């Protein structure tokens, strides 16, 4: 389903490594666990990133009664983070989709989708980076409603596993396969940050959080508390903060090595099909330098405090 007709050279330009100030929106299932909160804060404390809006994404796990409830809880969590950062929420935080994409050609309407389309189509120098760290129905729906945004955005998504992995049923992609198919097939510029063997390197511990996050203002104390409360037994325990991978990539792509390849074929069973060299290109992360990303986050928290 090619919705976007970017010339190959223009697509390559859009897939070039980010440099200088980046205009972005963040699409996040903020309440599904505790890593999105770190990504929200990291993005807002990054001077090189101009975060124009934050969208709540749907999710369904033990922390919600369904995708819509997950989206609403994520929206409320976004507000809690903004309050602790003294950042206004009006005209900045938006409710997203109440459900996942159910048909490849039928978008899910929401205020987040409307805002994304309006921002993407507004005059600007360079692309709008759409950073998605949850189920990707909001982004897919915007592309289905207004395919022209695909020529004006770059999608950076934490979702799925590498193509060499036997399946790609991780949380973000596995609950939203149809939306992921729209995104990978549409022809828009996509940067994928896989979970297995890439983002999963971003592990940290309670002692490290206590040393470098706790006491860094109201937001540092909040991040520390939700991290410490997430697991009862902290002995020999670490936790992956998956979502900061996307923000680390935008702050310094050298920290998240990547390569350009033909866009993958996502099958209905959440596995990858054989690579097709005739498909449009995308960029995929192949590694991540954990210490550089966490070091940058810790320094920004200290400076903010």
Language model: regions and residue ranges:
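N-terminal acidic, glycine/proline-rich low-complexity segments
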Residues: 1-305
């Amino acid at each position: 389903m090619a919705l976007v007709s970017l010339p190959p050279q223009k697509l390559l330009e859009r897939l070039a490594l980010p440099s200088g100030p980046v205009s972005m929106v963040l699409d996040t299932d903020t309440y599904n666990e505790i890593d999105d909160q770190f990504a929200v804060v990291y993005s807002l404390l990054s001077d090189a990133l101009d975060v124009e809006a934050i969208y709540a994404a749907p999710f369904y796990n033990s922390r919600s009664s369904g995708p819509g409830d997950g989206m609403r809880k994520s929206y409320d969590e976004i507000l809690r983070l903004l309050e602790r950062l003294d950042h206004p929420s009006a005209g900045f935080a938006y409710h997203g989709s109440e459900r996942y994409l159910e048909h490849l050609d039928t978008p899910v309407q929401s205020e987040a989708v409307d805002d994304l389309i309006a921002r993407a189509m507004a005059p600007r120098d360079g692309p709008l980076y759409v950073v998605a760290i949850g189920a990707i129905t909001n982004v897919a729906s915007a592309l289905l409603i207004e395919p022209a945004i695909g020529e004006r955005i770059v999608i950076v998504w934490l979702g799925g596993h590498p193509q060499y992995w036997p399946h790609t049923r991780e949380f973000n992609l596995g609950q939203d396969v149809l939306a992921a198919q729209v995104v990978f097939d549409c022809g828009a510029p996509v940067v994928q940050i896989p979970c297995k063997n890439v983002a999963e390197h971003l592990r940290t511990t309670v002692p490290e959080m206590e040393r470098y996050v706790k006491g860094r203002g109201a937001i540092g104390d909040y991040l520390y508390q939700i991290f410490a409360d997430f697991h009862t037994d902290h002995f020999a325990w670490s936790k992956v903060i998956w979502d900061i991978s996307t923000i680390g990539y935008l702050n310094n792509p050298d920290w998240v090595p990547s390569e350009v390849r033909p866009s993958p074929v996502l099958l209905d069973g959440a596995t990858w099909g054989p690579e097709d060299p005739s498909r449009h290109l995308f960029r995929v992360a192949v590694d991540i330098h954990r210490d550089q990303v966490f070091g940058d986050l810790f320094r920004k928290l200290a400076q903010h405090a």
